[in-house]
Design a protein with these regions (language model features):
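Glycosyltransferases and closely related glycan-assembly transferases
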Residues: 87-100, 107-123, 136, 140
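A short, well-ordered alpha-helix in the C-terminal region of glycosyltransferases
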Residues: 342-356
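Donor-nucleotide binding loops and adjacent catalytic segments primarily
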Residues: 46, 178-183, 187-271, 304-308, ...
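C-terminal alpha-helical cap of glycosyltransferases
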Residues: 356-373
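Acidic donor-binding loop of glycosyltransferase active sites
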Residues: 97-99, 262-281, 288
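Conserved donor-binding/catalytic loop of nucleotide-activated donor transferases
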Residues: 118, 266-268, 282-294, 313
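Conserved nucleotide-sugar phosphate-binding/catalytic loop shared by glycosyltransferases and other
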Residues: 3-10, 27-78, 83, 230, ...
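Active-site-proximal region of nucleotide-activated glycan assembly enzymes
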Residues: 34, 42, 53, 116-179
């Protein structure tokens, strides 16, 4: 079997493609893979690191700002759209895939559209509750649209053919154990709060969570693990300004990055984070109560819609960034952590919404489209 995967721009589009490829490889080791990505995107590093062959096209989105620069950018985008379609057709004809899989991002547009026009079987995977513009445009042209959550269906053309598969979740997350994780981290029976804003860090989350962490550093009521990110190196100084001495607070674990997220999340009683699709899938799989602070700086405000899918299921609480203050976050955290019954209800509802067999479902869809079932 020959499989071509197209997706990129952010890790949220690349990691699902890598997870899908990894599972297919596990099931059919003789499968040949080719990834197509955008030159300069994160996929340029992540895909070769995972051991897959890769080819590139150049594509960009339209600049929506009415300015001279925006006009110049849009002229370039039109040219790139034409050349990327030509390049995509050439790559597909040379590789001769049995199926093309798109996981979102601008790059998947010309590749999946070209494949469909050439008569190649095509499927796309949408990670978010509110779909990206590329996947919305492709939905009518592909053989199957795979959705992470049922809520996404209402935002697509009704004529598309859907399958709810969930998002691929790493096996480390699925097998993580709370007691083992807490023992590994050396935490006691006090509540554990886990907070993070992504690898680069989120200034608003760092500022918002500082009061909660500083108070725990002073009165010891919670154990707190927080990652401030690449651009948050000022965070320890902010805690110091608030009267928290990190070197004396053994209940605080303040880091730049979290490299053992499976352990930290398994140990947590409450998670405070953004609402990226893959992170939420991990929260659901582990049944973790969460306070979600969606990033407003994402396409189609999709993180808000991701968060609301969990909020509406009674599995999480939400604070929009414009409303975020240290006091409000402390109030919500205290309200949840002081109410074991409420915490258990959130956890139960999170698990109810989880799809832990996403890889198997996706593989089943692929086999069905290829007529291998």
């Amino acid at each position: 079997m020959r499989v071509l995967l197209a997706g990129g721009g952010t890790a949220g589009h690349i990691n699902p493609a890598l997870a899908i490829a990894g599972f297919i490889k596990q099931k059919k080791p003789d499968t040949e893979f080719l990834f197509v990505g955008n030159k300069g995107g994160m996929e340029e590093t992540l895909v070769p690191q995972a051991g897959y062959n890769m080819k590139f096209i150049v594509i960009s989105g339209f600049n929506r700002k009415l300015s001279p620069k925006g006009l110049v950018d849009n002229v370039k985008t039109v040219k790139r759209t034409i050349t990327s379609s030509i390049d995509a057709k050439k790559i597909i004809k040379e590789f001769k895939p049995d199926i093309c899989i798109g996981t979102g991002g601008y790059v998947s547009g010309p590749v999946i559209r070209a494949a469909a026009k050439l008569g190649v079987k095509t499927v796309i995977h949408e990670q978010n509750a509110y779909p990206g513009i590329t996947n919305k445009m492709l939905a009518k042209e592909v053989d199957k649209v795979m959705l992470a959550v049922p809520d996404a269906k209402k935002h697509f053309d009704k004529k598309a053919d859907f399958a709810v598969t969930g998002n691929p979740v790493r096996s480390k997350i699925l097998t993580a154990n709370r007691e083992e994780a807490r023992a590994k981290l050396g935490v006691d029976e006090r509540p554990v709060v886990l907070s993070f804003g992504g690898s680069l860090g989120a200034r608003k989350i760092n500022e918002g969570v500082a009061d909660l962490i500083a108070r725990s550093g002073i009165d010891g009521r919670y154990q707190h693990i927080h990652a401030y990110g690449k651009y948050g190196k000022w965070f320890p100084d902010l805690l110091k300004e608030k009267g928290c001495e990190l070197e004396k607070a053994d209940n605080l674990d303040i880091r730049e990055f979290i490299n053992d997220m499976d352990v930290c999340m398994a140990a947590a009683d409450l998670v405070i984070c953004r609402a990226g699709a893959i992170t939420l899938s991990e929260i659901q799989a582990l049944g973790k109560p969460a306070i979600l602070i969606p990033s407003p700086n994402v396409a189609e405000n999709h993180q808000y819609h991701n968060a609301m899918a969990l909020v509406n299921a009674g599995a999480a609480d939400i604070i929009e960034e414009k409303d975020l203050t240290g006091r409000l976050l402390m109030q919500k955290a205290d309200n949840m952590l002081s109410n074991p019954e409420k915490l258990a209800e959130y956890a139960k509802n999170a698990r109810k919404t989880a799809i832990t067999d996403a890889n198997e479902r996706i593989y089943s869809v692929i086999k069905g489209v290829l007529g291998l079932v």
